[in-house]
């Protein structure tokens, strides 16, 4: 264990020895979680699929393992001074409960916009909370500063050998629960869980393939593997906030690069579909990052036409805002190819709708939106229930054959998040530009937006969509003159919100411009 405290790059044998020794200590706080068979999904995918229920830990996530492993290994002098961490999520609760179990002081620095439910959860586990900074980076900088001035030990969320070894205890349990696994799928944020699982499985059962799974919009490990070293992402998506990490850890990268057998990237819709599978199969309500491993498993099976394999994924956590489920319920059908979203152009004349309805036939229409634009043609937004990708292609082919122009919007995020609710008609102002923003869910956010952007330029479209997360999505259009671009870009920089120019979006072009 001493090697893991002092050596930033321990050997595989050092890790294995530490994981084995921690196998008793970690359970002073954590519990052995079940590896549960997913019967319905196994039948559907023609493989035996198990899910590791880390949502059943006392803090409802695997993070307790790594936090307790490191904190319990500190010297008496370090324990007396207490521990400090920066987190707005599961790591914060893991550190707080670990410290409480060991009778230590724990200070958790959280961003000022952290939802009260997360702050209360940390306090409920005995942690002291300091709200500081506008984002995680500022909170982390403050935590490191305080760790030095108060002589407290900083507990990192993933990039420390003891944290990695603590997460590896999960793999020891899996080997005891199902001995003949062929694949294990592990979500990757900072890489601590994947590194800990992979290094142990490759020691005892090297034939098991360990596959890392990342969200497409926060794939920091995949970016590092392509570059050959850890690198900063320009932007990370926040739906699966538990894996929204800008840069993979140095040690976790070293281990993942060496021991992982492959990577799978999934999108938010695929994660939503996996969340639905977890509920339908084992009645578990996972947070988005908690379902990431299962989403990757399903995609990997489809891509590689696998059958008859024994496969496991990790349900890493279940700390989610209840309102997130509204978004999940809307998007899970698309993630399973059970709903097609289409833009269909037809003549603006009597009988066109009837002809369209005959082509669709008895298929279930999930939504239908239309707004008159001109007397030449009409463009409708329609959702149709489908059995699979093949049926969607069949619908598009049938509509095209009958003289309708069809554009598939199923993968257009602007269409799925905003435009489906904005059938208000087109504008004649060709100087309008459309932007999407990640909007912090905090008091004063809208006021700041309007004070910086709403005084100087006319806002001609505005739609807000909440995910039940720390950030929501806003779609806004501005009427800009040709000379406004430089000043507007400067105002966007002053605003400080993550944004993207989506003026060329297909959905905008079809329905709103």
What is the meaning of each model-derived region?
Residues 1-445, 449-513:
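PLP-dependent amino-acid enzyme catalytic core
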């Amino acid at each position: 264990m001493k090697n893991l405290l002092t050596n930033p790059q321990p050997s595989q044998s050092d890790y294995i020895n530490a994981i084995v020794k921690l196998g008793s200590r970690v359970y002073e706080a954590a519990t052995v979680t079940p590896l549960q068979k997913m019967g319905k999904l196994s039948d559907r995918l023609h493989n035996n699929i198990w899910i590791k229920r880390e949502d059943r830990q006392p803090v409802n996530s695997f993070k307790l393992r790594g936090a307790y492993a490191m904190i319990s290994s500190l010297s008496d002098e370090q324990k007396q001074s207490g521990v400090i961490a920066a987190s707005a999520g599961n790591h914060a609760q893991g550190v707080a409960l670990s410290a409480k179990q060991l009778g230590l002081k724990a200070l958790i620095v959280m961003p000022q916009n952290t939802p009260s439910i997360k702050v209360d959860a940390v306090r409920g586990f005995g942690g002291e909370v300091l709200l500081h900074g506008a984002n995680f980076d500022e909170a982390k900088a403050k935590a490191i500063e305080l760790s030095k001035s108060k002589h407290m030990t900083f507990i990192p969320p993933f990039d420390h050998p003891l944290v990695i070894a603590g997460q590896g205890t999960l793999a020891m349990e899996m080997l005891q629960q199902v001995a003949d696994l062929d694949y294990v799928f592990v979500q990757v944020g900072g890489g601590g869980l994947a590194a800990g699982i992979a290094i142990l499985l490759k020691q005892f059962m090297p034939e098991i393939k360990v596959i890392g799974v990342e969200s497409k919009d926060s794939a920091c490990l995949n970016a590092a593997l392509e570059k050959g070293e850890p690198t900063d992402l320009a932007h990370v998506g926040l739906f699966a906030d538990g894996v929204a990490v800008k840069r993979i850890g140095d040690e976790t990268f070293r281990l993942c690069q060496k021991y992982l057998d492959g990577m799978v990237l999934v999108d938010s819709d695929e994660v939503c579909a996996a969340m639905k599978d977890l509920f339908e199969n084992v009645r578990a309500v996972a947070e988005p990052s908690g379902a990431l491993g299962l989403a990757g498993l399903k995609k990997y099976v489809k891509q590689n036409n696998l059958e008859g394999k024994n496969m496991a994924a990790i349900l890493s956590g279940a700390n989610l805002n209840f309102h997130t489920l509204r978004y999940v319920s809307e998007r899970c059908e698309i993630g399973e190819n059970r709903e097609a979203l289409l833009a269909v152009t037809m003549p603006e004349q009597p009988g066109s709708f009837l002809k369209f309805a005959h082509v669709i036939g008895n298929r279930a229409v999930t939504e239908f939106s239309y707004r008159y634009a001109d007397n030449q043609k009409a463009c409708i937004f329609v959702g149709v229930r489908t059995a699979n990708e093949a049926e969607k292609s069949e619908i598009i082919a049938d509509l095209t054959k009958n003289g309708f122009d069809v554009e598939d919007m199923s993968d257009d995020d602007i269409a799925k998040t905003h435009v489906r609710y904005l059938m208000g008609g087109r504008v004649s102002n060709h100087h309008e530009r459309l932007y999407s923003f990640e909007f912090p869910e905090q008091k004063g956010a809208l006021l700041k937006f309007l004070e910086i952007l709403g005084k100087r330029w006319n806002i001609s479209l505005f739609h807000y969509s909440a995910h039940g997360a720390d950030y929501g999505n806003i779609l806004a259009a501005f009427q800009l003159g040709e000379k406004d671009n430089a000043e507007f870009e400067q105002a966007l920089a002053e605003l400080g919100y993550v944004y993207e120019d989506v003026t060329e979006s297909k959905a905008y072009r079809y329905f709103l411009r």
